[in-house]
A protein has these predicted regions:
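Structured catalytic/nucleic-acid-binding cores of DNA maintenance enzymes
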Residues: 1-174
Length: 174
């Protein structure tokens, strides 16, 4: 990628003409001398609410997930960016472990409070990582090792059409 990024307080003045500015509440990321930039608004319209929004729209996220078939697996739904934007494979596995939920559980057998707990865990884990407080993974890429909570052997296998590898503890994630 060409160009140079800087992150600064929003109140800081800028000299020159930036190529791209991404504004947060207190800070902004500025790209100088960037490459060709194309915005695809139609693609953005299909993306669900951002798990890192401040605050995240948990009600809308839960409502989006609830529109899915009851037999769809929770772990697969959390990776669907149309439902909830931002959760990747690592955060899916770790959030479900924190919430004690199996990635294989059907959505129809998952209570709203459980779904919210998984979404809140994902948001907290991701925010912590952005702030430099990333803790050691409990299950992600730890197949065959002992679960740090219950001692059962962590398992892994592909899930969904994309066959993304799910890591989970069969002892404490139900």
């Amino acid at each position: 990628m060409s160009g140079r990024w800087s992150v600064r307080p929003r109140s800081a003045g800028r000299r020159g003409r930036p190529w791209l500015v991404l504004r947060g509440r207190d800070r902004e990321a500025v790209l100088w001398n960037g490459p060709v930039l194309e915005l695809h608004r139609r693609a953005l319209a299909r993306v669900g609410p951002d798990v890192l929004a401040d605050p995240p729209d948990l009600d809308r996220m839960v409502a989006n997930v609830r529109r899915e078939p009851a037999g769809r697996e929770l772990g697969e739904a959390l990776l669907d960016q149309r439902l909830v934007a931002g959760i990747g494979n690592t955060w899916r596995c770790e959030a479900l472990w924190q919430a004690r939920l199996s990635p294989w559980r059907p959505l129809g057998e998952t209570a709203d409070a459980e779904l919210r707990a998984a979404l809140e865990a994902a948001a907290a884990l991701m925010r912590g990582s952005l702030a430099g407080r990333r803790s050691r993974n409990a299950v992600y890429r730890r197949a065959g090792r002992a679960c740090p909570r219950c001692g059962a052997t962590i398992r892994s296998r592909g899930q969904g059409d994309a066959n993304r590898i799910a890591y989970w503890c069969p002892g404490c994630q139900v």
